């Protein structure tokens, strides 16, 4: 399997409970390296751009409001098969359906407040990473 990069967001429901370290420990335990990380407060424009694919969905406004409600931690993760590996570590979007040992099973409050985001494909990972990081901020 090839070394690849993926994008992660630790969402406001997790940062408000000071879970960044616990989530990072699960990421690293899975064999992924955190090669870039910063804590930010996402602007409305950033959130609307990031989630533009959901603009026509009824939950779009609530999602944007949630993502700007508090700090988030944006990250670039690197490793063999990083995209699928991180999606496995995150667990199902619905925490009640997430497997034991996953981030969402351990920390998510609900489907809406599910603690983390991860890219779903190499193309989206590249776009998402570029939205939040300059090349010199990613140090592998």
Curated annotation (Swiss-Prot):
Q: What is its EC number?
A: 2.7.4.6
**UniProt keyword annotations, A-Z:** ATP-binding, Cytoplasm, Kinase, Magnesium, Metal-binding, Nucleotide metabolism, Nucleotide-binding, Phosphoprotein, Transferase
Which residues are ATP-binding?
A: 11, 59, 87, 93, 104, 114
Location of this chain's protein in the cell:
Cytoplasm
Q: Name one Pfam family in it.
A: NDK
Major enzyme class: transferase
GO BP terms: CTP biosynthetic process; GTP biosynthetic process; UTP biosynthetic process
Q: How does it assemble?
A: Homotetramer.
Similarity-based family? Belongs to the NDK family.
| Record HAMAP family | NDP_kinase
Give the function comment from the record.
Major role in the synthesis of nucleoside triphosphates other than ATP. The ATP gamma phosphate is transferred to the NDP beta phosphate via a ping-pong mechanism, using a phosphorylated active-site intermediate.
Protein name per UniProt: Nucleoside diphosphate kinase
